[in-house]
Regions:
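Signature of N6-adenine DNA methyltransferases within the class I
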Residues: 22-23, 27-36, 57-64, 78, ...
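Short helix-terminating capping/connector loops at secondary-structure junctions
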Residues: 45-49, 73-78, 104-107, 131-134, ...
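Conserved acidic residues
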Residues: 50, 137, 373
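Conserved SAM-binding strand-loop segment of SAM-dependent methyltransferases
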Residues: 106-116
Length: 487
């Protein structure tokens, strides 16, 4: 069954231009991934009828995998399948595939070509009786990955989970939680980006108000998920259950091959994965779980200690008229720091002869006091060994300037005390915190909101750490020695 449907899907992909599919956020799941997702369900085989939903069904690969899994497990009841799909090019293929499934299984099906989000209610106070036709026992999905404007109909329909311009994938996910019967299960393949940060905060609050995570699968290699699609977005499979009763542990599995042949499983305490602030951590081994345990035992943050990280002030391509390549004697210019000024030994090296290293402006929003800072690169490549790459900026090295500025591809932390400055640097430049951030955030971007939320020691301890580092090489090795002593 699955292979026949897969072949029709491959034929469609070969004919449909990728740009057309990208307009829908449309990427098709591989057969092995679909099979793995379907086997994650704990189907109740005693139910006389099962209601199954696949929103954004595409050609029906995931629906077929779920139905086939039920048949393989010996389910003898009736399967009622509902599929949403709005792409008129793919709907005829979907209907053909569902009819094929109908001939081989005890199955009824409906294909809805309406908008999955806007055609049904979404609110905690909606009468359950009014929602009965939108309730399902099991939901499987590969939701569309597409950023939409904050005033798009879908965003306006679901303000409870939106912050700024949302992505359709988590609106589909939130609506699917709304669609689940109590104790129902959902298995979705989604990007990893939802696990942290302010952008997804409302969604995470909604998720954990209504459901709990049961299992997670991580793809070590990003190009193995959508085998014919050249997708490099970091993705995961997640299984949730509509219940507020938390399991003791979450099963986290991982694989680096397209056929899941090197599958590993790891049981992690629920409270290690889901933090009190609803950030989600996804360790894949005991070492990473140990990192989380050590850091999450601390209670302060950069924010509580009033040394928050901020993003650099200048978007250089928007401010070209105030950028200068060199100092000009007749006007007042100030240093403008870029990520390229952060050296590998933790020093700030400026100027280096690049264009736009000076700024001439009196606009307060583009200038900051010439104080002591830690500069942190906002972007690193996937191949680089460290995600947190920082340098110590000392105002005493540039005494003639009252102000400086920072390009928005770096983050900065201002510290009045030198001991505090070096102590915070020791934390961020340590292996422990680099590992912690990598577990928290799978992307290559260093987000100030997430760094500000990372647990750190109290100010007195950080100052003592800084006193130990002051005057020493600013290497990770030295930082590790100090951090190991205090944390």
């Amino acid at each position: 069954m699955l292979q026949a449907i897969l072949q029709r899907t491959k034929d469609f992909i070969a004919k449909a231009p990728k740009e057309d599919r990208k307009r829908y956020g449309q990427f098709f799941t591989s057969d092995r991934t679909a099979e793995y997702m379907a086997q994650m369900f704990h189907f109740d085989l005693s139910k006389p009828e099962i209601k199954l939903l696949d929103a954004g069904a595409g050609t029906g690969i995931l629906s077929a995998a779920a139905v086939w899994s039920l048949m393989q497990r010996g389910y003898e009841g009736k399967i009622h399948l509902v599929c949403y799909e709005t792409d008129t090019h793919v709907v005829p293929i979907l209907i053909d595939n569902l009819e094929y499934m109908h001939q081989h299984a005890n199955l009824t099906y409906r294909v809805l070509t309406e908008n999955y989000i806007t055609t049904q209610p979404f609110a905690d106070n909606v009468n359950l009786f009014d929602l009965r036709e939108y309730r399902y026992d099991y939901i499987i999905g590969n939701p569309p990955y597409l950023k939409i404007p904050k005033d798009a109909p879908e965003a306006l329909h679901m303000p409870q989970v939106c912050y700024g311009a949302p992505n359709l994938y988590f609106l589909f996910w939130a609506m699917a939680i709304n669609n689940l019967n109590e104790d129902g299960e959902l298995v979705y393949i989604v990007p990893r980006s939802w696990t942290s940060g302010a952008y997804f905060e409302r969604f995470r609050e909604y998720l954990f108000k209504h459901a709990t995570i049961q299992a997670v699968h991580l793809f070590v290699s990003r190009d193995k998920v959508f085998s014919d699609e050249s997708v490099l977005q970091e993705t995961m499979i997640i299984k949730i259950k509509k219940t507020t009763k938390q399991p003791e542990t979450i099963d986290i599995s991982s694989s680096s091959t397209a056929d899941f042949s090197d599958l590993t499983h790891f049981q992690v305490p629920y409270t290690t994965v889901v933090a009190h602030n609803h950030y989600v951590f996804l360790p894949t081994n005991n070492e990473e779980a140990g990192v989380l345990a050590r850091v999450n035992a601390l209670s302060d943050t950069l924010k509580t200690l009033q040394v928050p990280m901020h993003t650099g002030l200048v978007v250089d391509f928007r401010e070209r008229e105030v950028l200068k390549d060199e100092e000009e004697p007749e006007i007042e210019t100030y240093p403008l720091f870029y990520s390229s000024h952060i050296s590998k030994d933790g020093q700030i090296v400026w100027p280096v002869g690049k264009s736009g290293e000076y700024i001439h402006t009196d606009r307060a929003g583009l200038l900051q006091s010439n104080s002591n800072y830690i500069f942190v690169k906002r972007f690193t490549s996937k191949e680089e060994p460290r995600r947190l790459q920082c340098g110590v900026y000392l105002s005493s090295r540039y005494p003639k300037y009252k102000y400086i500025s920072t390009q928005n591809k770096i983050n900065f932390i201002e510290c009045k005390s030198l001991d505090m400055l070096y102590g915070v640097y020791a934390l961020l430049n340590s292996t422990l915190y680099d590992q912690y951030y990598r577990i928290l955030n799978g992307s290559t971007q260093v987000n100030s909101t997430e760094v500000n939320a990372m647990p750190i020691p109290p100010a007195s301890t950080i100052s003592k750490m800084g006193a130990e580092l002051s005057g020493k090489p600013l290497t990770t090795a030295y930082c590790d020695q100090i951090v190991e002593k205090w944390i």
